């Protein structure tokens, strides 16, 4: 089984983690804060402009679980406002916990307050990552 460490639990890190877990990898997310989704907890905008197409492509490629959770917590769909067309807006106060439950339910190990401070290189490859508390992850796909 592959072991993968994902640095950062924002939308991209969560999506990458889900994909890796679905392919059979053992996955750890190192998140420096106390919650997932990062800046995704600020605006709550999903499926606007080009993101609509990207979302539908992601679903078609097997990434539906994350969007099913997002859709469940969407407050407004298909709205237009300056800079955004066809936007869906999810409830930023409610989305993080269900996403956390989803990834943990898939066997993904989420480690909060886990800041990566350094990487060790071997040539042009990452050999290990070092955490703020001194712990190192080695021999993983980073």
Where are the predicted features?
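Phosphate-coordination loops involved in phosphoryl transfer and adenosine-cofactor binding
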Residues: 1-3, 113, 139
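Short, glycine-/Ser/Thr-/acidic-enriched flexible segments
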Residues: 11-12, 34-35, 117, 134-136
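Conserved beta-strand-loop-beta-strand element in the redox core of flavoprotein oxidoreductases
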Residues: 120-138
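Conserved N-terminal/central alpha/beta ligand/cofactor-binding core
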Residues: 25-26, 31-118, 122
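Beta1/beta-strand and adjacent pyrophosphate-binding region of the FAD-binding site
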Residues: 1-12
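Aromatic pocket-lining residues of Rossmann-like dinucleotide-binding sites
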Residues: 20
């Amino acid at each position: 089984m592959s072991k993968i460490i994902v640095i950062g639990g924002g939308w991209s890190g969560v999506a990458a983690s889900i994909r890796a877990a679905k392919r059979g990898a053992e996955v750890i997310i190192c998140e420096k804060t106390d919650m997932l989704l990062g800046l995704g907890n600020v605006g709550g905008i999903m499926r606007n402009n080009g993101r609509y197409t990207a979302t539908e492509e992601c679903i078609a490629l097997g990434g539906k679980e994350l969007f099913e959770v997002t859709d469940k917590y969407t407050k407004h769909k298909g709205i237009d406002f300056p800079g955004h067309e066809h936007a869906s807006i999810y409830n930023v106060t409610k989305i993080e916990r269900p996403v956390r439950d989803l990834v943990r339910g898939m066997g993904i190990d989420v480690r909060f307050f886990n800041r990566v401070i350094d990487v060790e290189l071997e040539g042009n490859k990452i050999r290990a990552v070092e955490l703020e508390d001194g712990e190192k992850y080695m021999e993983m796909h980073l």
